């Protein structure tokens, strides 16, 4: 028996539209918050520094209200450095037939991207300032439908699913958006939570699949992609240990595989001071180069420190990369200090 997923999607969305057919929103609250980050970064190896000073600032507008049918609505819009609108999100809770789950129309990130590196860190990931890591991202950056159930069947496991009908960020009403005509739907789901009967042990699993419609052309447009990741993190007292493995596979006319392992350890010296060591090993194999066994391993190592005093946080990062950007004999290093 063949099941037409597109028809099922249409039926599901039609039912959803019916359950969300409301007439008015009661008055709610609107607030504006912001953040500012000042940094100093010095690079070495293949890269040059230029001006080491940087600043990032962001404003977030949030609002909330309640519909006539009792469904709660929350909205969020971020405004970036260039004073341009960026990610937006509309979240519904209390939707009929969905129980405690939330439903969102969002471009604020995808479930699998949120767990791309869950090893414990004091300040920044090992790949934050050097190299270029191909990690799992799913439909991150695109506008889609997100379903989140924080506690599935009382198990403590969080279910987070995301569907993106083609690529592109949020567009105007009745408009469309797209990055590339070849990329179609993205489906992804993650499961995260505590491991039963083992205090301090957390787990996470995630999978993402992206379709491409150009199935017969001898180009990269005909290659579908799959991503998967799994992690374990254990904490006892101020000590945390973590390990993770991710795979990103693009197949079709050829196969490009990224196999990445993450390891990290952090220690909270006090309530205000934490330190961590992180390492990443990522291997790229490309069958289109004529050798299925060929691969370039990109390695990252970093030490980071975080100190908090009142509302201010100071972070320090010392990171190195070898075979950066999956290119042999290309090395980079970075030393950064950041105040938030």
Show the residue positions of the predicted features.
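Outer-membrane beta-barrel proteins
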Residues: 1-340
């Amino acid at each position: 028996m063949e099941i037409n997923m597109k028809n099922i999607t249409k039926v599901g969305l039609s039912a959803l539209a019916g359950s969300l057919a409301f007439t008015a929103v009661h008055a709610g609250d609107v607030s504006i918050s912001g953040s500012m980050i000042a940094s100093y970064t010095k690079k070495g190896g293949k890269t040059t520094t230029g001006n080491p000073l940087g600043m990032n600032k962001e404003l977030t507008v949030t609002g909330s209200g309640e519909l006539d049918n009792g469904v709660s609505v929350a909205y969020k819009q971020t405004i970036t450095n260039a004073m341009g609108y960026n990610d937006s999100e509309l979240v519904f809770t209390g939707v009929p037939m969905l129980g405690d789950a939330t439903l969102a129309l969002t471009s604020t990130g995808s479930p699998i991207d949120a767990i791309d590196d869950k090893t414990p860190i004091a300040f920044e990931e090992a790949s934050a300032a050097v190299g270029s890591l191909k990690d799992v991202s799913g439909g991150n950056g695109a506008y889609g439908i997100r379903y989140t159930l924080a506690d599935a069947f009382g198990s403590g496991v969080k279910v987070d699913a995301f569907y993106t009908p083609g690529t592109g960020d949020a567009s105007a009403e009745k408009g469309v958006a797209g990055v590339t005509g070849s990329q179609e739907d993205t489906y992804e789901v993650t499961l995260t939570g505590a491991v039963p009967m083992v205090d301090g042990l957390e787990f996470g699993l995630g999978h993402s699949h992206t379709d491409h419609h150009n199935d017969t052309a001898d180009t990269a447009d005909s290659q579908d992609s799959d991503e998967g990741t799994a992690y374990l993190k254990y904490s006892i007292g101020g000590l945390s240990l973590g390990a993770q493995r991710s795979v990103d596979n693009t197949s079709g006319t050829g196969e490009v595989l990224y196999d990445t392992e993450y390891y990290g350890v952090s220690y909270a010296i006090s309530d205000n001071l934490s330190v961590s060591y992180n390492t990443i090993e990522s291997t790229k194999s490309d069958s289109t180069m004529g050798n299925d066994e060929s691969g370039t391993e990109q390695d990252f190592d970093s030490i980071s420190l975080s100190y908090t005093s009142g509302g201010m946080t100071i972070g320090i990062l010392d990171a190195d990369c070898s075979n950066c950007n999956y290119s042999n004999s290309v090395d980079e290093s970075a030393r950064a200090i950041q105040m938030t």
